[in-house]
Structures are given as C-alpha cells and as structure tokens.
Regions:
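Mid-to-C-terminal alpha-helical segments outside catalytic/metal-binding sites
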Residues: 1-33, 49-57, 65-66, 285-289, ...
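Active-site gating/metal-coordination segments in enzymes
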Residues: 3-22, 81-197, 203-206, 219, ...
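Catalytic pocket-lining loop regions of alpha/beta-barrel enzymes
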Residues: 4-6, 10-12, 165-300, 311, ...
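Short, well-ordered coil/turn segments that N-cap beta-strands
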Residues: 30-33, 62-66, 106-113, 137-142, ...
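Histidine-centered catalytic micro-motifs
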Residues: 33-44, 215-218
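Conserved, mostly hydrophobic/aromatic
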Residues: 38, 67, 93, 114, ...
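Catalytic metal-binding/acid-base residues of hydrolase active sites
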Residues: 40, 73, 119, 147-149, ...
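Alpha-helical scaffold segments that flank or form the walls of functional sites
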Residues: 44-109
Length: 359
C-alpha cells in the first residue's frame, strides 16, 4: 500500500515551558507508585520530546516507576518496503528504553512496553511486519495501535494519521483479516476514535471477543468548532456509547487525553495554566463515567504526554488524576494507577530503589 500514513509532526507546535511553569503545586500522594501507560517520544522539526524530556516530566515529583510508549510516526525507516517503515520506530524506542534500563538516568524505566504501528489493512501479510517488530523490540514490544479517529463535521479536527474511513474498525474486511493476526501472536490492540466512532469499536470488540483491546483517551469526546456548542449533546451520546462498549469484557479504557485541542476545554488559551482542581472539575463527568462503566480493573490513568502538555504540566496532571480518584480504596487506586496497565501490557514488576525487574 502506497504511503498509508500521514505524519503527526506537522500537527505539533512547540510547547511554552515558561507558561507551564506558572502553575506549580505540592505533589499529592507522592508515595503512590504509578505506571504511565501512554506517552510518545519524537524529534519533529516543530517539537522534540526524547528520553531526557520524558524523564524531566516523570521526575517532577510523582513516583512514576515505568512507562509505555505509543506509536506516533517517529523515526520511521527512510528506505525499504512502505509496510516495514514503522519498524524503525520500534528500533528507536527500544534504544531509548535500553538507555533508561541502564540506570544511568534515574530509577524510572521508560518504555518497558512499546506499542507500535503496522498497517492491519495488509490483511494476513501484516504478520511478517509484526514478527519483525517483535524481533527488534527487545522483549518490550507489546502490541499495535491503529487509530481510526474520523470526523467530517469540523475542518479544524484532523482525521487519524492512518487515513481511516468512518467505519474502518467495523467493516473493513482487510483490516479484520490483519486484526486477527494480533491474537495469533499474543499482541494487544490500542484503539483511538472520536466519540462518534465508539460504536464501530464496539462492533470490532464483539467480532473479536478474545482480543485484548484498550480504548485511548476516554473515547475522544469532541468539543472544538462545530462541537463546541453541542457539549451536552456530545456528553449524552458519548456516555451511552461508553456504557455499551464497557459490556465487552475484552475492552479496557485509558483515563486521560482530554487536554488536546479537539476536546475544546481551551486551557491553553488562558494566561496561566489550570490547577489540578480545575482540571479535575472539567474532566470529572468523563473520568467518573468511565470508571463506573469499566471498573478499576479495566481502567488506567494516562498522561498522553507531550500532546496533553498543551494544557498543563505533568505534575499538575497527575495531581488532577489523584483528585479524581480520591474516593477510591487503596486497592482500587493500585489498579487505576498501576496494576491495570501492568496486567494489560504484561509489564515487569519493579522492586526496590533501583527498580529491579521481576516478572
């Protein structure tokens, strides 16, 4: 398939670190150990976010023990078959992860899990690509994300970098053929749709009921442009579709990703970044609905950095998540902040001051 992907880099603008520093807070529950199951690494002309950058964020006060990298069209191979170019991203991230695992850069282990991209629309032929990604992943390669975010109502909203249709998850026969290979190889699947596409994921999850799936970013409730004046309508339809999706026991959900422009909260337009109280208040209807629908054992908080860094700092974000989980028990917090992610991605258990790895 000729050039099946667009690049994310053209959509990223440099972040304003001076602005982000205007809101600082004491760290809440600093003793709570956290796995961040969703962040990116890249070096685009518009913005750089590599190992030292993520470590600066994870080292800002919360006890982040390990992280999971999600594909973002970074460091693709420059030559070779088009279908195999995303293998370069796995090679790059495995190198960053190996640097982190050396212990030279602190105790947080970056990218103990790697989620890459392969074009599942290749059908059964995608197995060759997946096997090569597993081979170069150093034991860290966990699965695939193939985004199907699609909106034709608001010109400011970009469709997914995989160039999907509105119903790729639901009725693309070649995609389904490739999707079936994930189970054969024991790989996970990250899904990303806007709220209008949640029913297509529900259809996919029902068709492949044994495939572990996690929906990113609370299912993408839109609030930009056309959707800005329809927030109540969006919340109602989103809530209905999230509850229906949660009936699929093979599906989990990531709690976060609400600080992007498409969500329409516009925190990035303010003179000062929001406090964790303000973030928690804005996000509560979405986060609480997800936790109620899926339960703590099928829900995990995520940073989605540096994309969500548009709206606030890493320290403030995790403070907001802790505020949102304030009523949870210790066991429920362990699930939401750590164990659900560890189980889904088959991550190592890390012990001691040097984060010794034990399976």
């Amino acid at each position: 398939m000729d050039k099946p992907y667009s690049t994310i880099g053209s959509r990223m603008a440099g972040l304003n670190e001076t602005w982000l520093a205007k809101t600082r807070e004491p760290i809440l529950e600093p003793e709570l150990t956290v796995i961040d199951p969703h962040h990116h690494l890249w070096d685009f002309p518009e913005h750089r976010y590599l190992l030292q950058d993520i470590l600066a964020d994870t080292g800002s006060g919360h006890d982040i023990c390990q992280t999971v990298f999600l594909e973002c069209t970074a460091f693709y191979r420059a030559a070779g078959p088009e279908a195999e170019k995303p293998i370069g991203e796995v090679e790059f991230v495995n190198g960053q992860a190996a640097m982190s695992a050396s212990g030279q850069y602190g105790t947080t282990r970056i990218a103990t899990g790697i989620v890459g991209l392969a074009d599942l629309r290749l059908g059964a032929r995608v197995e060759q690509v997946l096997e090569k990604q597993i081979a170069v992943g150093g034991g860290r390669f966990k699965g695939i994300r193939f985004v199907a975010s699609f909106d034709n109502m608001e010109p400011q909203i970009h469709n997914g970098h995989t160039n999907p249709t509105a119903t790729t998850y639901q009725d693309d026969v070649r995609f389904h053929e490739g999707f079936a290979v994930l189970g054969k190889l024991g790989l996970t699947f990250d899904a990303w749709v806007y709220h209008t596409g949640i029913p297509t994921l529900t259809a996919l999850a029902r068709k492949f009921s044994d495939q572990p799936i996690v929906l990113d970013h609370c299912g993408g409730p839109l609030g930009l442009g056309y959707w800005a004046s329809r927030r109540d309508e969006v919340l109602t339809s989103w809530r209905r579709d999230i509850r229906e999706l949660a009936r699929c026991e093979n599906v989990m959900i990531k709690l976060g990703g609400l600080g992007m422009r498409v969500n329409g909260f516009d925190f990035h337009k303010r003179e000062r970044p929001p406090t964790s109280e303000e973030l928690a208040a804005a996000w509560r209807p979405y986060i609480e609905t997800c936790i109620e629908a899926f339960g703590p054992k099928r829900a995990m908080f995520e940073s989605n950095f540096p994309v969500d860094k548009l709206s606030g700092s890493y320290a403030v974000y995790w403070n907001a998540f802790k505020r949102l989980a304030a009523g949870a028990s210790a066991d429920e917090k362990a699930q939401l902040f750590r164990e659900t992610a560890r189980s889904f991605y088959r991550l190592p258990r890390l012990y001691g001051p040097n984060r010794e790895s034990r399976q």
